């Protein structure tokens, strides 16, 4: 059996795996235990009451968190004409069509988000094998294929998170950095849960949001009592 590091021993001693913590207590615990030498992200796992094997129960979308994620995001946009100028004005780092596709084919991938106007999808479609496995393929369901590319760029820069359930029906995403004020982390979590509620598949039965856990990049998960959140999610 692998030997536990001192840090993991402390986490195990402090975190009661059987308990659901009040959100304020949970955040305080994460802050106390975040001792990595970098500013850790605060991640969330939301267990949904869906059957992930059924395509009509899968949950996918995007929402802008009120306080952002604390990450600086580089955006690439496939578009042309007036839309290209609008994308640049909104802050996109890379804007183009075939020229941008050629850069990507050469392995130049210096961006975090890819956005495309509908007329550019004929170009983006050639890049599925490159962008798809990295989770970067533009998709209308998460607002990254849109005629209004400038708004999509602004959303990406403002701290938009994209979410999609995994095969176990769990959503994994980030809600900020551990050095955020506790209130900002709480409000970001509440905003995410509200977005997930709006995205609830009509076919999903029973309790929809079954469990919410938050963790830091290097830390253990802390289960959160939903009763203390202003996003009563069932």
Curated annotation (Swiss-Prot):
Record has RNA-binding as a keyword: yes
Entry keyword annotation includes Transmembrane helix: no
GO MF terms, alphabetically ordered: rRNA binding; structural constituent of ribosome; tRNA binding
Keywords in alphabetical order: Repressor, Ribonucleoprotein, Ribosomal protein, RNA-binding, rRNA-binding, Translation regulation, tRNA-binding
GO BP annotations, alphabetical order: regulation of translation; translation
Record-stated family: Belongs to the universal ribosomal protein uL1 family.
Record note on quaternary structure: Part of the 50S ribosomal subunit.
Function statement: Binds directly to 23S rRNA. The L1 stalk is quite mobile in the ribosome, and is involved in E site tRNA release.
Designated name of the protein: Large ribosomal subunit protein uL1
Gene responsible for this protein: rplA
